[in-house]
Amino acid sequence: MVNLKELSQNEVLELINYVKSLRKQNFSYSQISKKIEIERNIKISKSTIIRWCKNSNNPFNKTKFIDLSPSPELSYIIGVYFGDANIYYRKKTGSYYFRIKVVDKDFVDVVKNSLIKIGLNPTISYVEEKTRSNRWHVEASSKSLYKFLSQNKEELFKVAEKYPEDFLRGFFDSEGYVTSNKIALENYDLELLEFSKELLKKLDVHSTIHIAKKKGTESNIRGEIYHYKDDFYRLSIHRKESVRNFAIKVSFSIKRKRERLQKLLESMDKH
């Protein structure tokens, strides 16, 4: 049996509308409760149904109501989530969080503004760390965003397809980099890279995917020896016109990455 607290924001809204429609059809409160239990395996009390029908209860009093309809900002957040960001549940406080830790202040500013745009109130902090570079943190508390991002990635892809430039910018801001001859992005998730490749293709950006590190390959990270748990993939953009189209249509939010991209274009123009 599913508890109301386990439902997403949109699922609760849909359920409220369904409850009210049943009431208009002259179902009793008890009948509505039983019908929802049988049809949807959702446990909802008679008293809650009464409050909903009389508009005397707002189920979002303790939940930030945010705009999860497709938008450039939400698409960007999804791209960031597939890269540097993570979501987690803090059991001590019973709160759900979206968080990202990065070295670039301009990056966290864009993430912060995107979170604000969809209705959240994120916080930014600067944390000094002994074992790695000091990093900026941006964090926002939202059960609705947590549940939204916890969906199958195919559902998130639907939003990304509506705003591909913003999704790709978020993903490349997180995982992308520029070398002397290419733009590249690395990730364990081959399906995610293939999806990104298709989006790039629609923007007239040719890219290729290959294995960057095979499973079991040894790596030294800050003095610690690690082994790749799975094949690690790289998506690369080499062709001059594709690099140029990427710069025009996607680019980076991060200044240092934009500067490297500009240098790559200048180098390509000389040859």
Curated annotation (Swiss-Prot):
UniProt xrefs under InterPro entries: Homing_endonucl, Intein_endonuc_central, LAGLIDADG_dom
Pfam families linked to this entry: LAGLIDADG_3
UniProt protein name: Uncharacterized protein MJ0398
Domain DOD-type homing endonuclease: 77-205
UniProt-listed PROSITE patterns: INTEIN_ENDONUCLEASE (PS50819)
Disulfide bonds: none
GO molecular function annotations of the record: endonuclease activity
